[in-house]
Amino acid sequence: MSFLSVSRLAPKLLNSKNATYFLVAARNASASTTNLKDVLADLIPKEQSRIKNFKQQYGKTNIGQITVDMVYGGMRGMKGLVYETSVLDPEEGIRFRGYSIPECQKLLPKAPGGEEPLPEGLFWLLVTGQVPTEEQVNWVSKEWAKRAALPSHVVTMLDNFPTNLHPMSQFSAAITALNSESSFARAYSEGVHKTKYWEFVYEDSMDLIAKLPCIAAKIYRNLYREGSSIGAIDSNLDWSHNFTNMLGYSEAQFTELMRLYLTIHSDHEGGNVSAHTSHLVGSALSDPYLSFSAAMNGLAGPLHGLANQEVLVWLTALQKEMGGEVSDERMRDYIWNTLKSGRVVPGYGHAVLRKTDPRYTCQREFALKHLPNDPMFKLVAQLYKIVPNVLLEQGKAKNPWPNVDAHSGVLLQYYGMTEMNYYTVLFGVSRALGVLAQLVWSRALGFPLERPKSMSTEGLMTLVGAKSG
């Protein structure tokens, strides 16, 4: 059994008497090196062999049925992708390589004096399936700092965008322009053997993740801070700390929030628009810059990455209409009136989840610790108490519980980041951790070009024996 397989057993052992022994053994499995690429080079052949054997034995096994509703319904619930880095359970929420968010908060290394996990540690976990040591996380921080500088043509491009161009459009365009630096594109054009693809995708992915905070911070400064300088990367600081410094925020609590935000938004299984897009475009052997840029164009859509902005707009309108503190009864009436008018309560419900999103829960815990008396947080907390019961009474919602978007905007606002148009860029910086970790594995495992079969309505009707008319 490969280490990746064994590591997925860790959550089941966390509460057992063997938990401490197991976690020490897991860390020691590759703790002798701090170089992530070396660890990957050891893991990949074992995983290739494991999957080859699995396919030989079970390749023709049926794993589910496809209905007409699934085909018309955005392929919802259809099992059609292999995505290794995270799995979304309807009852538990997201698990990163088998670890829940609370487990990641407990196990992943933190900054000195910090309480939230470092995104570098999560990236190591997503790539390897292993909980990293502090030394390994520190290596990633320094590696990203070393790779962070932007080429001059990208800086010039960002400085010349019109101010009315949406931050996500700027973000995507700048990422596409980084394609000039692609190691993978260059190696492919020179005829590199396909068994080496993953090495160059890894290099591009590390470079891209390193540069994203610089791109995002430059967009923020150009649009909202009169084009002031983002400053220089400090190789002694972690990825999130450098990011908040470049954005112009010096408060330690905001940096802690950013570490949490970038960790919990990083990955959410493979079927969501941004993850699936990067997987699809990458399957054409487009380099990581092109693949991730395409993913960001999907994330920019209002049904994917703009939800936290919509929540904040709705909360602000609610607060303005209702005034100061509102009784639970009045709030309940307001929610009912919202639903009866044909509108929805933004931030509630999820395509897969059937319980409160654990990403919401950890943000709520952060707020309870750091901003318990903030009026907007108190409003969010009041809604959490009322909305699910109203939605259950209405009887239409499959999931009446809050999702991640119900909370994140309120936290950012509290620390002074009020520019709602920018929030999806933060989401994009975070999402790189998950989709690029998977992209490396997709090339390592030799996943082919994605090419599902499409059908016309007439063809579907013929297939199921329905009469057209």
Swiss-Prot record:
Oxaloacetate binds at R359, R431, R451. Keywords: Mitochondrion, Transferase, Transit peptide, Tricarboxylic acid cycle. GO terms for molecular function: citrate (Si)-synthase activity; identical protein binding. Its EC number is 2.3.3.1. GO terms for biological process: carbohydrate metabolic process; citrate metabolic process; tricarboxylic acid cycle. GO terms for cellular component: mitochondrial matrix. Citrate synthase is found in nearly all cells capable of oxidative metabolism. Homodimer. Belongs to the citrate synthase family. This is Citrate synthase, mitochondrial. It comes from Thunnus obesus (Bigeye tuna).
